[in-house]
């Protein structure tokens, strides 16, 4: 267990929180992390590609010429693959690219991504945002005060409409919940801001 500083949104120290090293301070497993990122990127693919095979191309119902006696090669339809305008052989069809990973591997990947951010000093814990109403300007001031880079992942314990609406119009800022935290979002962001309650919730699930 290690202690981490908890900051207020004005940048001052609010206190500290003790978090499990098994979640936030492991040696990142790069191969599992790579596999988890590939899994998520594959799941994002639409897979709607399609071409027409010989049965789907319009026309070609009549035999082009008789079977024997012409001296030419026998043909059954002008929509066969060797004809111009014919169907495609073994072309792409709609499919899902999603596949599964064991739960232990998925959790190891998340722990690795979190530990990587902590090791990079790209992990900031705040006590709470405390927005009473959506204020984009105030949220930008918070990011400036906490010296955050352009690509930031903000993690709250539960859905916080005021935080989501405040950050929605700021390029490079993404808001998610502790339950929705995933490897692709973590690795895509340059920095992570997480509330103390969200950090405890993540620890509870992954420990």
From Swiss-Prot:
Residues 55-75 are annotated as: Disordered. SUPFAM superfamilies: Ribosomal protein L4 (SSF52166). Belongs to the universal ribosomal protein uL4 family. Pfam families: Ribosomal_L4. It comes from Staphylococcus epidermidis (strain ATCC 35984 / DSM 28319 / BCRC 17069 / CCUG 31568 / BM 3577 / RP62A). GO terms for biological process: translation. One of the primary rRNA binding proteins, this protein initially binds near the 5'-end of the 23S rRNA. It is important during the early stages of 50S assembly. It makes multiple contacts with different domains of the 23S rRNA in the assembled 50S subunit and ribosome. This is Large ribosomal subunit protein uL4. Disulfide bonds: none annotated. Part of the 50S ribosomal subunit. Residues 60-71 have a biased composition (Basic residues). GO terms for molecular function: rRNA binding; structural constituent of ribosome. It comes from the Bacteria. The gene is rplD. Keywords: Ribonucleoprotein, Ribosomal protein, RNA-binding, rRNA-binding. The keyword Protein transport does not apply.
């Amino acid at each position: 267990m290690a202690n981490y500083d908890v900051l207020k949104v004005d940048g001052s120290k609010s206190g500290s929180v003790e978090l499990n090293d098994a979640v936030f301070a492991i040696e990142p497993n790069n191969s599992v992390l790579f596999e988890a990122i590939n899994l998520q990127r594959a799941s994002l693919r639409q897979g709607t590609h399609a071409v027409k095979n010989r049965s789907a191309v319009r026309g070609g119902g009549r035999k082009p010429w008789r079977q024997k006696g012409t001296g030419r090669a026998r043909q059954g339809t002008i929509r066969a693959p060797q004809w111009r305008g014919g169907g495609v052989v073994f072309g792409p069809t709609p499919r899902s690219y999603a596949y599964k990973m064991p739960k232990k591997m998925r959790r190891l990947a998340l722990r690795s991504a979190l530990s990587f951010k902590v090791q990079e000093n790209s992990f900031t814990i705040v006590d709470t945002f405390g927005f009473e109403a959506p204020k984009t300007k105030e949220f930008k001031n918070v990011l400036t005060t906490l010296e955050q880079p352009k690509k930031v992942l903000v993690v709250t314990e539960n859905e916080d409409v005021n935080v989501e609406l405040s950050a929605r119009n700021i390029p490079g800022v993404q808001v998610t919940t502790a339950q929705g935290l995933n490897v692709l979002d973590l690795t895509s962001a340059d920095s992570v801001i997480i509330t103390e309650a969200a950090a405890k919730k993540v620890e509870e699930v992954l420990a």
